[in-house]
Amino acid sequence: MNGQGRLAGRVALVAGATRGAGRAIAVQLGTEGATVYVTGRTTRARRSEVDRPETIEETAELVTAAGGTGIAVPTDHLEREQVRALTERVDREQGRLDVLVNDLWGGEHLVDFGKKMWEIGLERGLRMLRLGVESHIVTSHYALPLLIRRPGGLLVEITDGTTETNKDYRESLYYDLTKYAPLRMALGLGTELEEYGCTAVAVTPGFLRSEQMLDHFGVTEANWRDGVAKEPGFAISESPVFVGRAVAALAADPDVARWNGQSLSSGQLSRVYGFTDTDGTRPDAWRYIREVTAGGREADDAEYR
């Protein structure tokens, strides 16, 4: 482990770290020297229903290569005994938990934008809620007793949108509920954790260039701008590293309690903590969506980077 990082000696659990934001968050915590337990359902031996090639073993290796200690633990966070065993293992091996990141989702294949609630299969909609809400609750139930043993613990709920942006309906009822619940969890758990000297926040990336999104646009991280021809709004997208750096900055902030209960965005936090995306810019996707996409303003995307 890198003993020089700002998070050296700290222990993190990133639940849902197989790919996308979760993977990048785990790696950035590792860059700062943390020991990071990474969980997910897709391993080198078995794929989840999402059917993507990325694995949690790869994520753990990336964490270690970045300077931390990555530990992969295959876990289905809807299976309570698996989550209980996970937290007991962290306790047994480390005796502490400093950062819990709930990035559990894996429901992209279930989203039906543009359909009325009653037009969506009930089991399909409820599965989305289980993957994106129940999993967060189960994980918090078992992990927070370990987190609160020491003052300074941090819970990060990863979602899509802030309390401001999610005031508007997100087109699909099940998706709307799934992505609003983590905002309420951060608020409620922030209140409950405060007496233990711990903090809870919700963090959202902007237009995330996840592996799945890059595949959707037929591009790679190296030539992602070619996707702008298909979707102009893709110009304001951000790499997963950006939100990873946001969470790492929060975890290393001795005054992180100032954010307790709040919903935050990667773009907002970049202006506070001074980090950038991999290309040196600071994408502010939510302001772009508000002013350009929804507001009808004509603008150069460079104004929002």
Task: Please give the residue ranges for each predicted region.
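Active-site loop of short-chain dehydrogenase/reductase
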Residues: 10, 68-69, 96-97, 134, ...
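C-terminal helical subdomain
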Residues: 202, 222-305
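Rossmann-fold scaffold of SDR-type NAD(P)-dependent oxidoreductases
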Residues: 15, 97-110, 132, 156-157, ...
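Amphipathic alpha-helical dimer-interface segment in Rossmann-like NAD(P)H-dependent oxidoreductases
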Residues: 92, 127-149, 163, 190-191, ...
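Short-chain dehydrogenase/reductase
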Residues: 1-94, 105-118, 123-124, 300
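Conserved Rossmann-fold SDR core element
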Residues: 29, 96, 183, 193-210, ...
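Catalytic loop of short-chain dehydrogenase/reductase
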Residues: 106-110, 118-122, 148, 153-195, ...
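Conserved internal alpha-helix within the Rossmann fold of NAD(P)-dependent oxidoreductases
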Residues: 125, 135-140, 154, 164, ...
